[in-house]
């Protein structure tokens, strides 16, 4: 069953009308309603504000890392465990082929349904998850495989156990190691990019965001609670924080914005997967033309340029 946001009510009404027309076997009505749906979808999604894009980034029907992996990674084989503590299901690692190119895919996975969300810890990795990501990244480096990182997390897990096992060290270690990997790396925010939890798999040669994704140092609710002592002012905070893909592209904090189908990734998962796979293949072709020394040097220069400003 599809989920609808407040600003999608008009779309829901037409979807319901189409379903009823199909039950009645009225194909003529279905044809007319589908045309109306196309117009309404274009109208609704044409001028989304920042808060609406945040809602889409968190949409329960939005494709997660495994959805994309199943869509475009051929001959996929999952790799488990950090070889030190346990396997963290909030981080998924696969090797396979994207557009005929062998690659490693490392992603954050939120999970669907109560049991799966609990198993995946709502997409909040423990330190062993980030260490698993590092182990697999080093494996990719050993076999000269490019890496695609799929970022989608509300943040790294802040629990006592995670802190005791070195959450901050695990994140910091990944930042250092990923900056120096001797293979092409591409990171894409596919939903939520929550602070250090996102950065831990976000250091790459190319950092992109899906059109309706967000990337921030704190959630808008958390920001509103701190600044105004009122979490309900999240819409105001969302606008002020500049967390959308277009905002971050304008601030030169990301390299590219990957377009989504006109009706959003949550309504056209296959279309979104094609856009993401196409982006990876096209950028990889350019990165593979660089020598390893050039690749790492450009990556380091890019990292050091973050935060620079002009008076």
Curated annotation (Swiss-Prot):
Any one GO BP annotation for this protein: malonyl-CoA biosynthetic process
Catalytic EC class: transferase
Disulfide pattern: none
SUPFAM superfamilies: ClpP/crotonase
Principal localisation: cytoplasm
Keywords, sorted A to Z: ATP-binding, Cytoplasm, Fatty acid biosynthesis, Fatty acid metabolism, Lipid biosynthesis, Lipid metabolism, Nucleotide-binding, Transferase
Family label: Belongs to the AccA family.
Name of the protein in question: Acetyl-coenzyme A carboxylase carboxyl transferase subunit alpha
Biological classification of the source: Bacteria, Pseudomonadati, Campylobacterota, Epsilonproteobacteria, Campylobacterales
Name of the gene encoding the protein in the UniProt record: accA
């Amino acid at each position: 069953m599809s989920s609808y946001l407040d600003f999608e009510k008009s779309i829901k009404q037409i979807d319901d009308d189409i379903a009823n027309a199909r039950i009645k076997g009225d194909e003529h009505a279905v044809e007319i309603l589908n045309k109306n749906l196309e117009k309404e979808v274009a109208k609704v999604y044409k001028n989304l504000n920042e808060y609406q894009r945040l809602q889409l980034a968190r949409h329960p029907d939005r494709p997660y890392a495994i959805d994309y992996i199943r869509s475009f990674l051929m001959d996929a084989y999952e790799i488990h465990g950090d070889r030190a503590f346990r396997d963290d299901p909030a981080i998924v690692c696969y090797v396979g082929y994207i557009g005929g190119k062998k690659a490693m895919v490392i992603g954050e996975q939120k999970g669907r349904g109560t049991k799966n969300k609990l198993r995946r810890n709502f997409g909040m990795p423990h330190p062993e998850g980030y260490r698993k990501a590092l182990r697999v990244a080093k494996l990719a480096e050993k076999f000269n495989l490019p890496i695609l990182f799929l970022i989608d997390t509300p943040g790294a897990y802040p629990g006592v156990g995670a802190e005791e096992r070195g959450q901050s060290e695990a994140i910091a270690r990944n930042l250092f190691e990923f900056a120096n990997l001797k293979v092409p790396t591409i990171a894409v925010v596919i939903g939520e990019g929550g602070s250090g939890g996102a950065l831990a798999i976000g250091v790459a040669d190319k950092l992109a965001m899906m059109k309706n994704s967000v990337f921030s140092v704190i959630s808008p609710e958390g920001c509103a609670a701190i600044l105004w002592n009122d979490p309900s002012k999240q819409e105001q905070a969302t606008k002020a924080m500049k967390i959308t893909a277009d905002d971050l592209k304008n601030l030169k904090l990301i390299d590219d914005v990957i377009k989504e189908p006109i009706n959003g990734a949550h309504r056209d998962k296959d279309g979104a997967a094609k856009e993401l796979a196409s982006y990876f293949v096209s950028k990889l072709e350019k990165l593979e033309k660089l020598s390893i020394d050039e690749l790492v040097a450009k990556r380091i220069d890019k990292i050091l340029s973050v935060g620079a400003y002009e008076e």
